[in-house]
Design a protein with these regions (language model features):
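Well-ordered, non-membrane alpha-helical segments in soluble/globular domains
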Residues: 32-37, 176-177, 192-196
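C-terminal helical/tail subdomains of lipid-metabolizing enzymes
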Residues: 123-136, 141, 146-154, 158-164, ...
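Active-site gating loop/helix substructures
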Residues: 2-147, 167-170, 299, 327
């Protein structure tokens, strides 16, 4: 009996040890990278990526707590790995994607010396994990003017739908996973606030503005977006050149900011914005979009395969939300005039 008990305890200890240290003995990221390469990227390297659009893949470099960005232009991260240290031409796309998604159960990804410009130089290999740990929305490199990837205007798609709950909290592995989900959710919200809810001078010129159309697939497709847009004008979150493009004049905007607008006047502003963004046209497919939203919100951002109906739902919802948000927040990018 004692032997059986000891054997069981030893077995539990070994299994627990391997679970905690599985990356040391079982490099899961290498295996997944090989599958990525075989089934998706077919031995393509960064030099095979198109010149336009410029594709940038983010990973978090653990030792520097900074983003390492992979692209056809360069692979760089902070002062330890400036442009030219790592050569992008031969780095597999599969390695870049694996580094960008190495979370939470995959082992960290390293870039070996064979990809360095000087293979004999004593440079520590970067240790990479999911880029979302540092930059959950992929906005960091886009809104920096000195960045090689900086843009004046951007469309951000957030497909996250994680709902935090207390299920499985007694399990230490599940607990750690939920802690990471909480952290990434917090980063996501902070970046969204910076992109959408940062007060500005209404008179800012388009050339000096860095505007973002933020598309959150889990937002309910409804008229609430129009009301929220007016609230943003009220809180000085929308510059003049944007709201004027959607039919709101300066007098109306000032009354919104001063909180002196009557309900009837606000209703009229609502109708003006609707006319300029072609709300009636968007409503033609709204029932189909609501059905797509109901299906899409249950699609997880994990490695589980998607059904064709789920893919179609995501496409339908993303298209509708993108058209709406671009018409509201980036109207000057649309060539056709109402």
């Amino acid at each position: 009996m004692c032997i059986k008990i000891y054997s069981t305890l030893i077995g539990v200890f070994v299994v627990g040890y391997l679970l905690i240290n599985h990356n040391k003995y079982f490099c899961s990221s290498k295996i997944v990278e090989r599958y990525y390469n075989k089934y998706f990227f077919e031995n393509k390297t960064l030099k095979d990526l198109p010149d336009t659009p410029l594709i940038a893949i983010n990973a978090t470099e653990v030792t520097q707590n900074q983003l390492m960005t992979f692209s056809k232009l360069k692979v760089a991260c902070g002062s330890n790995y400036p442009q030219g240290i790592i050569l992008p031409d031969e780095i597999p796309v599969s390695l870049s994607v694996m580094a960008s998604s190495a979370y939470p159960l995959f082992s960290p990804v390293t870039i070996s010396a064979e990809y360095f410009a000087d293979t004999k130089k004593d440079v520590e290999e970067p240790v990479l994990i999911d880029g979302g740990i540092y930059d959950n929305q992929g906005l960091h490199k886009l809104d920096e003017r000195k960045s090689a990837y900086g843009t004046d205007f951007s469309i951000v798609s957030n497909a996250g739908n994680a709902e935090l709950n207390d299920e499985g909290m007694e399990n230490v592995i599940t607990l750690l996973y939920k802690v990471m989900e909480l952290l990434m959710n917090r980063i996501e919200k902070m970046q969204m606030r910076k992109a959408l809810y940062q007060p500005m001078e209404p008179q800012i010129e388009m050339e000096k503005d860095k505007r973002c159309a933020y598309v959150a697939l889990m937002w309910t497709p409804s008229e609430r977006a129009i009301d929220g847009y007016l609230n943003n004008i009220q809180d000085s979150l929308v510059p003049r050149y944007v709201y004027e493009a959607n039919g709101i004049n300066e007098e109306q905007a000032e009354r919104l900011r001063q909180r002196t607008m009557t309900q009837e006047e606000r209703r009229q502003c609502n109708e003006i914005v609707k006319e300029h963004i072609k709300w009636a046209e968007l409503c033609e497919n709204q029932n189909r979009v609501i059905e797509a939203w109901a299906r899409a919100k249950n699609v997880g951002t994990n490695l589980k395969g998607l059904k064709k109906t789920e893919i179609n739902a995501l496409v339908t919802l993303a298209e509708w939300q993108t058209i709406l948000q671009v018409r509201l927040h980036l109207p000057h990018l649309i060539h056709e005039q109402v």
